[in-house]
Amino acid sequence: MAIRKKSVDTLPDVASDFVWAVSSGSHHEPHSLLGAHPHEKGWVIRALRPMAKSVSAVVDGEKVELSHLENGLWQGYVASKKVPDYRITTAYQDGSVWTTDDPYRHLPTIGDLDLHLISEGRHEDLWNALGSHIHAVKGDLGLSHGTRFAVWAPNAQAVRVVGEFNSWNGIAHSMRVMGASGVWEIFIPGVGAGSKYKYEILTRDGNWITKIDPLAQHTEVPPSTASIVTESTHKWNDKTWLDARTKRDALKAPMSIYELHAGSWRQGLDYRSMADELIPYVLELGFTHVEFMPLAEHPYAPSWGYQVTGYYAPTSRFGSPDDLKYLIDRLHQAGIGVILDWVPAHFPKDEWALARFDGQPLYEHADPRRGEHPDWGTLIFDFGRNEVKNFLVAN
């Protein structure tokens, strides 16, 4: 592979405080420094590789050597009329060499319409806009597969993604804030389904706190608390039941509900094995519906599940989200409707969850007279805030 030297005499200067903020993962817009940026008749490429011996950008089959600026920031020049599709090759002191895609060369993966609807509190599929989602970006070098992350944290000074893929060191994956929306975003190539992650949030008072993803659709089995990137492969087979439901007059049709707590109905069952035992039992008793006590993720196993920490994630105690879909699918195929108990009244104060999510009251009302439940020791949602209403209604 040919090595191309930079073809300009000077590269743009970067203020040391700017470099420090980005290299420490505490800048609100790391993409404004890292990635590819226009310079003279080409592009300057910058990458953050603090422990590197040498760094180069692979462009059009050639290596463009990057020079070390300071504090782990490397930069080099590429003569190109269009934004180059490139990869970063990093050599370390131990002799290892890694070639990876650069998260900071990618455009935002959340659009202006999404941000507008979120701010107005009327995004009907919020779970598709925020959270973590498998994503692919097409470029000259082919598809770049990874995961897009987006989280609402309007009071944060900076937000980083930490996970197994970066050894729980978020400096490599600082997010950018999307204008005044309070939404932070990044696309991380190479991160796939099953990856565990959390968010590191720099609060107004300068402290870093670690939080779960409020829109995560899969979590670790408690007492572990990490969010998990997930991708559904379930194929629904309940069309017959859905069609019949649309034709039925629910106000005139008979209805009898069997309520159960999944954790104690019969011991040792998961979502899939529950289908085999629950369906014949409910049919024999003549019930038309089953109502599950809260299945959203909650930290305290002996409870009924009424203190929820993961509103968009079914509890992992009984399997994956697709396993729950399998159970619901089987119930529908048997002609049994499904009701899920929902808990919008309050949420717990666990420091790793929704409470003071970005260092300030966010999901809870700021006035403790309206934001705290003195009898239960829990927090009450700020129902007057658009984004919070959207979080609940979309759920």
Where in the sequence are the language-model features?
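Substrate-binding/active-site clefts of carbohydrate-active enzymes
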Residues: 218-221, 235, 239-257, 261-395
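Glycine-rich, histidine-containing beta strand-loop boundary motifs that form or position
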Residues: 47, 59, 151, 163, ...
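The feature marks proteins involved in alpha-glucan
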Residues: 1-40, 69-153, 178-259, 264-269, ...
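Short proline/glycine-enriched turn/loop motifs at strand-loop junctions of beta-rich domains
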Residues: 48-54, 152-159
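Short, surface-exposed loop motifs enriched in S/T, G, D/E and P with embedded aromatic residues
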Residues: 62-71, 171-179
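Beta-sheet entry/capping signal
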Residues: 146-150, 158, 288-289, 335-337
